Curated annotation (Swiss-Prot):
Domain Globin: 1-141
Function: Involved in oxygen transport from the lung to the various peripheral tissues.
Protein name: Hemoglobin subunit alpha-3
Gene Ontology molecular-function annotations: heme binding; iron ion binding; oxygen binding; oxygen carrier activity
Source organism per UniProt: Gorilla gorilla gorilla
Pfam families: Globin
Source domain of life: Eukaryota
Any one biological process term the GO annotation gives: cellular oxidant detoxification
Quaternary structure, from the entry: Heterotetramer of two alpha chains and two beta chains.
Tissues in which the UniProt entry reports expression: Red blood cells.
The organism's taxonomic lineage, starting at the top: Eukaryota, Metazoa, Chordata, Craniata, Vertebrata
Residues at which heme b binds: H87
Length: 141
């Protein structure tokens, strides 16, 4: 459960990402594909090279989902319900892969916002991403 301080930190951190959220989403995906090659299996039809249009496009989708979650911190299950259905029933993404992407998102934010990404912000964003993962995997059962 996110505390009021966590919610403030998450909103502030995501506010820094702002209009470039898709770029950061793509950067995190690239990190994930490089660091955890097994995650590429969900994207056999994508050009996964650096800067590809497909990775950028999916980065925008990831960023939009996270923006929706930030805007609905008190009701993420409803805000992400359709996305949860998609990942559980159609795409069948391994729940572990959400944790891998979360790690890459944290690294991306830390690398791009070193002075703003304090230990407290890191902890809050980590809790937020874990909450998003829990919601996205809730329909796997």
């Amino acid at each position: 459960v996110l505390s009021p301080a966590d919610k403030t930190n998450v909103k502030a951190a995501w506010g820094k990402v702002g209009a470039h959220a898709g770029d950061y989403g793509a950067e995190a995906l690239e990190r994930m594909f490089l660091s955890f090659p097994t995650t590429k299996t969900y994207f056999p039809h994508f050009d996964l090279s650096h800067g590809s249009a497909z990775v950028k496009g999916h980065g925008k989708k990831v960023a939009k989902a996270l923006t929706b979650a930030v805007z609905h911190l008190d009701d993420m299950p409803n805000a992400l319900s359709a996305l949860s259905b998609l990942h559980a029933h159609k795409l069948r993404v391994b729940p572990v892969b959400f944790k891998l992407l979360n790690h890459c998102l944290l690294v991306t934010l830390a690398a791009b916002f070193p002075s703003z990404f304090t230990p407290a912000v890191h902890a809050s964003v980590d809790k937020f991403l874990a909450s998003v993962s829990t919601v996205l995997t809730s329909k796997y059962r």
